């Protein structure tokens, strides 16, 4: 399955200015906040990546999957890596997750590909 999401960087910037850490803590873990380095483009990219993951899993953000169930880190080459807890990986029958984020013209776009186990 594939999920995709696009986010306005300016919209995220306004939310960060208005709600500060309270906004970030709704969807980012402490380590993800550090990775974003207060850059609106990175914050928007991480938000888009989590939304894209929820779409790839066909559940959206809600009871079955929260923003904080989705963990983002970076590879040694600074590429985004996405994981879920073992519990969620088993629940959704996931073998692997692949992710990509891009920024252009004031937008962040993210794509997530989910490979499922064949049981």
Swiss-Prot record:
Its cofactor is Mg(2+). Its main location: cytoplasm. Keywords: Cytoplasm, Fatty acid biosynthesis, Fatty acid metabolism, Lipid biosynthesis, Lipid metabolism, Magnesium, Metal-binding, Transferase. It is an enzyme of class 2 (transferase). Gene3D superfamilies: 4'-phosphopantetheinyl transferase domain (3.90.470.20). Mg(2+) binds at residues 5, 51. One of its GO terms (molecular function) is holo-[acyl-carrier-protein] synthase activity. It catalyses: apo-[ACP] + CoA = holo-[ACP] + adenosine 3',5'-bisphosphate + H(+). Pfam families: ACPS (PF01648). Its EC number is 2.7.8.7. It is found in: Cytoplasm. One of its GO terms (biological process) is fatty acid biosynthetic process. One of its GO terms (cellular component) is cytoplasm. Transfers the 4'-phosphopantetheine moiety from coenzyme A to a Ser of acyl-carrier-protein. Belongs to the P-Pant transferase superfamily. AcpS family. This is Holo-[acyl-carrier-protein] synthase. It comes from Helicobacter pylori (strain HPAG1). The lineage of its organism: Bacteria, Pseudomonadati, Campylobacterota, Epsilonproteobacteria, Campylobacterales. The gene is acpS.
């Amino acid at each position: 399955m594939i999920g995709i999401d696009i986010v306005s960087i300016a919209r995220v910037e306004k939310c960060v200015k208005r709600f500060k850490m309270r906004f970030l803590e709704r969807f980012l873990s402490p380590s993800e906040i550090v990775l974003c380095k207060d850059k609106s483009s990175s914050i928007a990219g991480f938000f888009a990546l989590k939304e894209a993951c929820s779409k790839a899993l066909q559940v959206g953000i809600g009871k079955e999957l929260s923003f904080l169930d989705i963990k983002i880190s970076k590879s040694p080459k600074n590429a985004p890596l996405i994981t879920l807890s073992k519990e969620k990986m088993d629940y959704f029958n996931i073998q692997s997750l692949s992710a990509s984020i891009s920024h252009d013209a004031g937008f962040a776009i993210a794509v997530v590909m989910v490979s499922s186990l064949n049981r």
